[in-house]
């Protein structure tokens, strides 16, 4: 069976960098072996099993579609349980595509998810129709609006990102919502064209 392995997780302040190794037959689905995420807060005290969540969220669907195994040293139990629901949904939507693969973690850890500095709800927010509809459905919980650079707006498109984040902040000012920006090389980590034709 093919394998995708999270080899390392390195944290420096607000940035997490992951090195991912994969079987030769899976190379066509990856543009690089390094996945990185930068937050607008320091994440150096976040437990390792929680830090693995962003990279696993990227590679697990690839594993399911290619009947591969993802290996990782540590992962958060709450994420693993939520991931099962994501997989079930994808299998119902695409039964021919998602029919194998899995996650093999050395340790699945129950972390204390006690509320800390942030004690509210959050939602991904681009300012598009879907994110506006999500906000309208959940506005009573006053979600923080999280925008991600690296999917629609590339990580190197600084001016375009400033404009996009400006629109998010304008909306947030009208609704008195907090905002957060995340930068991740989502669109340059995986080869989405190859995944779409798989």
Features from the language model and the residues they span:
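Short, glycine-rich nucleotide/cofactor-binding loops
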Residues: 122-129
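Gly/Ser/Thr-rich loops at beta-strand to alpha-helix junctions
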Residues: 77, 129-131
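Flexible loop/turn segments at secondary-structure boundaries
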Residues: 131, 152-155, 187-190
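RNA-binding accessory domains that recognize and position tRNA/RNA substrates
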Residues: 1-119, 137-183
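Conserved adenosine/adenylate-binding substructure
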Residues: 181-198
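Hydrophobic positions on the alpha1 helix immediately C-terminal to the Walker A/P-loop
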Residues: 134
């Amino acid at each position: 069976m093919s394998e995708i392995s999270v080899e390392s997780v390195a944290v420096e302040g607000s940035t997490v960098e992951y090195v991912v190794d994969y079987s030769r037959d899976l190379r066509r689905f990856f543009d690089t072996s390094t996945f990185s995420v930068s937050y607008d807060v320091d994440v150096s005290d976040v437990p390792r099993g929680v830090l693995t969540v962003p990279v696993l969220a990227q590679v697990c669907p690839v594993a399911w579609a290619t009947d591969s195994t993802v290996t990782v040293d540590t992962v958060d139990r709450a994420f693993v349980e939520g991931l099962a629901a994501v997989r079930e949904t994808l299998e119902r939507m695409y039964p021919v595509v998602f029919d194998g693969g899995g996650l093999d973690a050395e340790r699945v850890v129950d972390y204390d998810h006690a509320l800390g500095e942030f004690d509210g709800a959050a939602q991904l927010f681009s300012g598009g129709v879907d994110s506006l509809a999500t906000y309208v459905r959940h506005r009573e919980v006053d979600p923080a609006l999280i925008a991600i650079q690296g999917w629609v707006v590339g990580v190197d498109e600084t001016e375009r990102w400033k404009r996009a984040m400006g629109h998010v902040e304008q909306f947030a000012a009208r609704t008195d919502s907090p905002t957060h920006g995340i930068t991740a090389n989502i669109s340059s980590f995986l080869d989405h064209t190859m995944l779409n034709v798989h």
